[in-house]
Amino acid sequence: MSVINTNVSALYSQNAMKTNARAMSTAMEQLSTGTRVNSAKDDAAGLAIGQNMTSQIRGLQQAVRNVNDGINMLQTAEGAMVEQSNMLQRMRELAVQAMNGTYSDVQRGYMNSEFQALGLQINRIATDTKWNDQSLLNGELDSTTLDPTGAGSATFTFQAGKDAGQVVSIDIKATTLTSLDLPLSAFNDDGDMQIGTLATATITLTAIETALETINEQRANIGAAVNRLAYTADNLTNIASNATQSRSTIMDTDYALATTQLAKTQIIQQAATAMLAQANQQPQGVMALLKG
């Protein structure tokens, strides 16, 4: 049947061109952005899953940074304890030296001056050592909780995971003179912590050895906590890497597939354009009939 008001062939060609143009636009967008799912229309379920995984990945990455902050904090505390331990070792040497009967009390007095100065410096390190403007060794961090929810009530809270309930507890004891059973008030000429005489040097040596044991125990606890946090960071990094790979499979453009799709749609578009031109020529046959 020859008609001129309705060109069905042209309508089919136009519809095919519109559908193909959308597919070609999608392929070009995927190639341009490197992302397979650029909007919900591309893959609604994939977009939802991808966004959820993005949230998890970013949370895990931040958790790794927070755990590393915790490690840095603990290493700062241990570094201060190393210096305190060195000073206590020197104080022990002085006490042992003062116990030697070959020295006079005057000479022991010289040793005592260094001894007491070291004791005061140990206390200063404990009160002045800070990380992120927070004191570490003056007793403020006893029973600190590293809370992954970020809602802990302790001085320091670190998110060590992407979900609530992942809690790492550590204990940083004070290393002031008082906490080491070396009262600050005892470090003077009339106090107990001196080595000016043979008798006081003997008593003081025992106290210094006890303080050294306390410092060493604290360093061991911190070392264990650092190792625990380091393994936590490694595990979080591994989880984040696997999640990133999974998200890539869902969200990223497969360039081999997308370039094939683009080439296909370009060929179809050219063919559809040619067919539309042919369809538009069909009504011309009616003119031939009228002229005949």
Enumerate the predicted regions with their spans:
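Primary detection of the long, small/polar-rich alpha-helical "axial" segments characteristic
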Residues: M1-G292
